[in-house]
Amino acid sequence: FDAQIRLAGEGTLKWVLADAEGVTAASGEAEAGESASISARLESVRTWTAETPYLYTLTLSMEQNGAVSHQVSCRLGFRRVEVKGNVFTVNGKAGLINGVNHHDYSPEGGRTVALEVMRQDVLLMKQHNINAIRFSHYPSIEAIYDFCDEYGMYVIDEADLECHGFEWAHVYDMITDDPSWENAYVDRAVRMVERDYNHPSIIMWSLGNESCFGVNFKKEAEAVRAMDSSRLIHYEGDFEAEITDVYSTMYSRLKGLKEIGETKMKHNRPHIHCEYSHAMGNGPGCLADYQKLYRTYDRLQGGFIWEWYDHGIKTTDENGTVTYKYGGNYGDFPTNGNFCIDGLLMPDRTPSPGLVEYKQVICPVWMERLGEMGDLFAVKNYYDFKTLDGIYLECAVTDGKETFETFTIDSLHTEPGVEEILTIPHSAVDWKDNRDYYLNISVREKKETAWAPAGHELGHYQFPLPEKKTVSVKREELPVSVSETATEVSISCQDVVYSFDKVHGVLSSMKKGGQELVKRGPVLTVDRADIDNDMYKVNDWKNNYFISRGMEELEYMTVSSGQNKAQVYIQKHFGCYNQAWGFKLAYVYTIYGDGSMETELHGTAIRNPEFEPEFLPRIGVEMNVNGAFRQVAWYGMGPGENYCDSRQAAVMGVYETDVDGMHTDYVMPQENGHRENVRWVSLTDEKEGLLITSRGGVGMNVHDYTTEALRSAAHPCEIKKQDDIVLNLDWKHSGLGSNSCGQEQTEERKVRIEDFAMSFALSFTEREKAEERAFTVFC
């Protein structure tokens, strides 16, 4: 241990270094002057890491004539950061950064942020498994570094240096490579190092952000190294890793990142992804893909999501409605619009679906079943310094709603970086017919920590169980009657009536006892409300391919009936304005005497490869349901919204909410609330309503507004609600990606123009019997 101390005044300097329990580890004194050097050799110390943040306190006292004239103290940590081969290490171990970029921001105070809010930021990060912060793009207030030291966060501290605007003027290196600016560059880094040097959480000094590269950065790096050789130097703008200790990139696509991991490019330096997965609006997708690369290639040592917080300005109107405003809302122009609304945390400090997903993706305890349906599971400890002694597994056997067995596994001792094989058996259960069963495992903290209570969940996993029994029952044979006019076909069974529009070839009504359940039948749609991450696709979709103007055209319709069922066959063509691509559609509706209707839709793609969109937002159907049915229950992935490239945090289950609960309140309204793999959904009032079942599973959205209403709104308060409920059932729904700045949807998660088939059934249900009816299989 050693320290250099600047002094003013006369007297004797006395110092004490105490551990976290207050026990003196070392002490001494020195005569005061302009400066003093103190040092001590400690036989052993408890080291500091983000996982095990242990702090000592150094107290300095100036004494004159036996009395203390001045006293200060600061907390210190012991840790070593160095590069070994193509990885950087903390205390000798290569670590993985699961980080976020952080701006100082408050929706009420702007750049003025309360200390308690800063503390809550760090606590919330820890609770979501985040272990690192890049302060972008300037040093933050001093207190937050204390919180990072205390709770355990790795920090990249960044100099307040950015001259990105020169890039747009095509003279990017104008001042960066001009020696007359050397002092300005060096000064900003030196001030940062001098102020923040004593914080153990800081493992890298960043020379700045997006300022090209030139002689002034070389001088800046020299100055920083002269002051502090114990930390690494970072600067993404050093594209060749000429002066930095790590090779840093931003918004690298998955393919490019994999290439970095597989090669020794850029001097084989450790790689840091200083910005990635731009969290603007609905997203980011592909987080699990990035994490898989980080956990596969040693050289790829993780990165920092852009960014932590949505920068909306809070306003409240005379009615008490809160709106978060962004660029252009005050008549300012030019503007970047809502490009500042790009965080994992919403302006009201609600974790976004993206943050919930990120927490699961970076969970430090990973689990996988070995074999298709066995009892053997692999558990890997992705901590760098902690064993799993402090973790327990809370296990439950469930059908998605009812829990049949619970038990706890609390004997894990897995060492850091090690994989262990566990046997997790379960007892025999009186399985219900036609149900799916799962083993749900929640990974939890045994004891209270500084940042979370005992029992805090780090992550969760779900594994299907093999005990499903399929038992069918014979459908009750009841009469069906068909009546027809010049414009309509009506099919009646009991007191349920299905009406089909013969002019447009569409289900125009489903009624039960005179009450309308469905007001507009399924029609094909390939559109979704624009998401920020599709911003480079939207113009193409809207103005070149007119996907929001898709429509069906009837070719012909036939009706056949027997004593106990009737069938309506409708052949149609789907296309968009002035387009040669589309689908040939065949709807087959089978109506049974018990009042239920099975719907099959077969689509044959009409291709025109030279003049068709690369991919579509979705392929599915849309229906209008009676607006009185606002209670929503479903069996599928949940509880929150999930998409094909953002569903690690979702598990299969039976969930209940209302139509408002199916909406995610993004600052800039956009596609939201989707659920994947939905096997059934009921829309009811307090007593009864509509049940939709799909054995193969569909994607689902339920809202009280149209796609166009969502697309037209600039803020949530501007969304024009309607009486009807809009129900979307999707064959496929494209992923999210993060292409507002970065990776677009991966190829396998783009909905192509291709043949498809989907099926689902509609029926009336009493609310309390919806689940029972949904799991009934008829023959």
Language-model segments: residues:
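Extended acidic/polar, glycine-enriched regions
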Residues: 3-84, 430-433, 437-484
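Short proline/glycine- and polar residue-rich coil/turn motifs
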Residues: 29-36, 411-419, 750-753
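Beta-strand/loop-rich accessory regions of lumenal/periplasmic or secreted enzymes
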Residues: 49, 425-434, 449, 454, ...
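Extended substrate-binding grooves/exosites of carbohydrate-active enzymes
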Residues: 67-378, 382-389, 394-402
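Carbohydrate-binding surfaces of carbohydrate-active enzymes
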Residues: 294-505, 599, 769-773
